[in-house]
Amino acid sequence: MSDNKMKDSDSGKLLYCSFCGKSQHEVRKLIAGPSVFICDECVELCNDIIREEMQEQGAAVGDKLPKPHEIKKILDEYVIGQDRAKKILAVAVYNHYKRLEARNSKDEVELAKSNILLIGPTGSGKTLLAETLARLLNVPFTIADATTLTEAGYVGEDVENIIQKLLQKCDYDVEKAQTGIVYIDEIDKISRKADNPSITRDVSGEGVQQALLKLIEGTIASVPPQGGRKHPQQEFLQVDTHNILFIVGGAFAGLDKVIRDRTEKGGIGFSAKVKSKEEKGPVSRTLSGVEPEDLIKYGLIPEFVGRLPVVATLEELDEDALIQILTEPKNALTKQYGKLFEMEGVDIEFREDALRAVAAKAMERKTGARGLRTILEQVLLDTMYDLPSTENVSKVVIDDAVIRGEAKPYLIYENSDYQKAAASD
């Protein structure tokens, strides 16, 4: 309050709210500024207006948030198969971001966070599903490898480094990072080495699970500022992880055996029934019956399993699914190579038998969809090396003989018949 106004007040002159005109005696509090006054009632009214506007903005965001059906439809464009996993993810992600909107309301019901566990073999699409979700929702996204994490104080990455990576993805915008998605891969590799708690320190197994617990559940993580390293005198960025969606995934090799041990009560000795591979059925069918107790027996600590209420199992990809992956998604490998060759002014054709041969090879290697690019890179290496220096090539044709290594890719030259690249050999 200025000296004149203080004198006015001291001399007994009444002061009035500049907004509603009420005197200082009609309100509980009158706040003074430079040449202006505002009463507590007007402050409360302003707060109500701001709160209503924030709720309207939240509703507008809700309109933009894709519905579960729309989320699944977009996932279908990039990921082949895995329908049940897509449905589970679509519902979980939709509910997570609806939960963020609910924070602005005065409702007493607080919605809990539902982090997600993805279980599926290598190359089944776990990482791609998480990446596609983040791109669809336009939120910061980062991938962390659980095998590189150790407890604080040991050589390796602290769990806080995950949040630092997320901050880097959004130029250290803390508000934006607090609504991001984190995917932690290879989570099965930090399982406890034995079913019973160990008396020795397990810095990359149970210790990391303990360190991840608070981060996943929700805590205030202290992260060094941009480009900084941790030291005692440094000011840290405070990131609230309560609203960050954590998706963790792993292959969980051997989990199917743990599930079968629980579900199949066979006899002992000569009366025991030994089932063939065909009778056991596909591993993915067994994994779909996973229960929290199976994950605990596998080596995840009970508290960690409890922080992952949504569990989605992915199926092992068969040959037909791998062929679809090669051709159908928006960013299918055959389309990517088509674009690369188009930049050289050349068309590339993958025959049907070539696609089947690539899928069969990936099945043999047990690498899933991840192995498809490796196979095509090996097959096309020499062609991609020579093509920029070769003139008059209009088309490259790949058949099953090329994939099996029995022939080199066929080159079609302008105004000529098929000529094998190896014709001069």
Curated annotation (Swiss-Prot):
Entry GO terms, CC: HslUV protease complex
Molecular-function GO terms, alphabetical: ATP binding; ATP hydrolysis activity; ATP-dependent protein folding chaperone; protein dimerization activity; unfolded protein binding; zinc ion binding
Keyword Transmembrane helix part of the UniProt annotation: no
Pfam families from the UniProt entry: AAA_2, ClpB_D2-small, zf-C4_ClpX
Keywords recorded for this protein, A-Z: ATP-binding, Chaperone, Metal-binding, Nucleotide-binding, Zinc
Metal-binding keyword on record: yes
Top-rank lineage group of the source organism: Bacteria
GO biological process: cell division; proteolysis involved in protein catabolic process
Binding-site residues, Zn(2+): C17, C20, C39, C42
Function: ATP-dependent specificity component of the Clp protease. It directs the protease to specific substrates. Can perform chaperone functions in the absence of ClpP.
Subunit structure, interactors included: Component of the ClpX-ClpP complex. Forms a hexameric ring that, in the presence of ATP, binds to fourteen ClpP subunits assembled into a disk-like structure with a central cavity, resembling the structure of eukaryotic proteasomes.
Protein family per UniProt: Belongs to the ClpX chaperone family.
Designated name of the protein: ATP-dependent Clp protease ATP-binding subunit ClpX
Organism name: Thioalkalivibrio sulfidiphilus (strain HL-EbGR7)
